[in-house]
Each structure stands twice: as C-alpha cells, then as structure tokens.
C-alpha cells in the first residue's frame, strides 16, 4: 500500500498463469492505458537472441565485428555474450545525472530526444562508439556490470543481420506469443528500426503477459517456443555481478536475476519480475519526479515486494 500510494505511482498488476491475481491504478491512470516500460524492453532481446542461438544462427562467443562489419572499436572485438551481459567497457556511458552523458546523445540519435545539431542515424551513432579513454580493448576490469543501453541496440542489429527478417516482425510475433490484450507499441529510430533498448509501451496487464513469456522459459501462450528454454535456464544460472544496492543480483543476458526469478528495471520507476517456478509475474509502473528521473534507492523496495509476491505461498 505504501508503494502504490506514492504520488508518482501509475499501475501495478500480478498474474499467475492466465489468471489476473491483482491490479491497482492511480486515479489518473487506466487499466487500458499503455505506459512506457523503458529498459524492461531489453528483455525482448533475450528472447530473440536466445531463439537465434538455439537455432544455430548466432554463436555467443563470436565477436560483434564478425556479425556487423560496420561496427566501431567500441564493440568490434566484444563477444555477443559480453554484450548480452553488459560486460563491455567502451566510450559509452549512462549517467543520468550528467546532462552530457553519452546515453542522452544516443537518445537524440535514435529520435527519442531533440538533437541540438544534425540528426545522425542510430546506426551511425552506434558505429562511432569507440574505446574508453586510455583503453586498448573492451575488457571490463571493474568487477561488476557496466550498464549501456547501446548494447541492446547492438544486439538488435545482430538479430536482424542473422535472423533473416525485419526486427519488427519479431516484435509482432512477440505480441502474439505474449497474448497481449491491447497492443505492443514500440518506438523506432528515424529509419524505422525498433528501439529494443527502451522503446516498448504496454498496459500493466500486458507487461505481465510479456514477462510471462520469459517465465514460461520462452513459450508463447499457444505453447509454441518464441524464446529459448536452454538459453533462459543459462540466463538464470549466469551473469555478471551488479553493484549495490543490487549487489544480490546478476545481470544476465539482458535481464536481472538472483537465480530464481528474471526481471528488469526501467528508467523513471518501472520494474518487472517473473518466477518460472511459481508461474507468477508482477509489474510495477511509476514516473519518478526528480531532477534526473532516476534514484537507485527507489528500486530495492519495489524489487523486494515483487519478488515476494512472485514467490507465492
């Protein structure tokens, strides 16, 4: 009640299997109203890359440069697996308290923020990312993950290069696999390329249905695989340590995990958790109203609440 009573709360929903267990909405928000899920969108990359890996079209150990010859030094020698795990050190930074952070320049290139000068394409921006100052390679020597939304766009370009079809077709199939009640909305860059790094918008109920695809270990509502069961099991078991206040979690294949559940947060106050063992999925949507739109201390209580709900009992 404390979290759903916050002034920036939008919506919360919980499902178990195909049953709606709980939902709550702010006075100015409706059950049929889509909400930006921001970086929870990244979980779609797990499903798509996992399917391509299981089909033998992607080797997680190959370098990004082997798949995308046009990529720059910031990703050329990084492996697909390291990009999935946010285990790449390069010249891209994502510090929301810094108005000049690379992430905001990335938003301008992808059409999510008004540019101050020219209008570079998202692909050109990604291609121009170089090594970190003074670095000779992209090896992450920090001991924890290095969060970069550009990583997800790189994976999206990899998926389109190896998938043999437009990325938008994958998202149409994802909407079907989730069995969305409304629609799966996704922002695109100026060239029409979907933004998996943070462009999806869903209702609270449909966000749970989206998460449940991962909770079913890749199966759609019709029982057909959209993601990959072995890839998601490896996701639960693997990953790179996250720093405090999420030190008990790992970043694994475009998800957060503690080995029991899979989840992800979104800029501005969103979080999603799905528990494959209990079949429960819970989503929390809000819009933080502070200077940067981000507060690391805001998420732990939400994560703890959703994890407890999804544990059942």
Task: Identify the meaning behind each predicted range.
Residues 294-313:
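Short, gly/Ser/Thr-rich active-site loops of penicillin-recognizing serine hydrolases
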Residues 150-158, 198-219, 270-287:
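Active-site-proximal alpha-helical segments within enzyme catalytic domains
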Residues 18, 35-60, 83, 155-159, ...:
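Active-site SXXK
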Residues 1-29, 272-274, 279-283:
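A short, well-structured edge-of-sheet supersecondary motif
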Residues 19-22, 65, 99-140, 165-184:
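Short, charged, amphipathic alpha-helices and their helix-cap/turn boundaries
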Residues 138-147, 195-201, 264, 270:
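Solvent-exposed loop and edge beta-strand segments that line ligand/cofactor-binding
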Residues 181-185, 232-284, 289:
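Active-site Gly/Thr loop motif
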Residues 54-96, 161-198, 202:
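Active-site helix/loop module of the DD-peptidase/beta-lactamase fold
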């Amino acid at each position: 009640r404390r979290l759903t009573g916050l002034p920036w709360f939008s919506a919360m929903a919980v499902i178990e299997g195909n049953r709606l267990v709980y939902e709550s909405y702010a006075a100015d928000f409706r059950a049929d109203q889509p909400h930006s899920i921001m970086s929870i969108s990244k979980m779609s990359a797990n499903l798509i890359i996992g399917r391509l890996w299981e089909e033998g079209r992607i080797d997680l150990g190959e370098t990004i440069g082997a798949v995308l010859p046009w990529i720059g030094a910031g990703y050329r020698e990084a492996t697909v697996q390291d990009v999935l795990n946010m285990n790449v050190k390069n010249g891209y930074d994502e510090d929301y308290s810094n108005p000049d952070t690379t992430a905001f320049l990335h938003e301008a290139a992808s059409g999510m923020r008004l540019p101050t000068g020219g209008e570079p394409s998202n692909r050109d921006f990604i291609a121009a990312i170089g090594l970190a100052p003074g670095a000779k390679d992209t090896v992450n020597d920090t001991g924890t993950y290095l969060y970069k939304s550009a990583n997800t766009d790189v994976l999206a370009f990899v998926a389109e290069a190896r998938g043999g079809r437009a990325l938008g077709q994958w998202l149409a199939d994802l909407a079907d696999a989730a069995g969305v009640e409304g629609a799966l909305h996704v922002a695109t860059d100026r060239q029409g390329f979907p933004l998996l790094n943070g462009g999806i918008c869903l209702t609270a109920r449909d966000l749970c249905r989206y998460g449940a695809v991962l909770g079913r270990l890749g199966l759609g509502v019709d029982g057909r695989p959209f993601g990959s069961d072995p890839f998601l099991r490896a996701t639960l078991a693997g990953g790179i340590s996250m720093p405090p206040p999420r030190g008990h979690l790992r970043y694994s294949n475009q998800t957060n995990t503690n080995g029991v559940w899979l989840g992800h947060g979104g800029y501005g106050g969103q979080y999603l958790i799905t528990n494959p063992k209990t079949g429960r999925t819970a989503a929390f949507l809000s819009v933080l109203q502070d200077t940067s739109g981000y507060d690391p201390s805001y998420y732990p209580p939400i994560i703890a609440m959703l994890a407890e709900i999804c544990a059942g009992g």
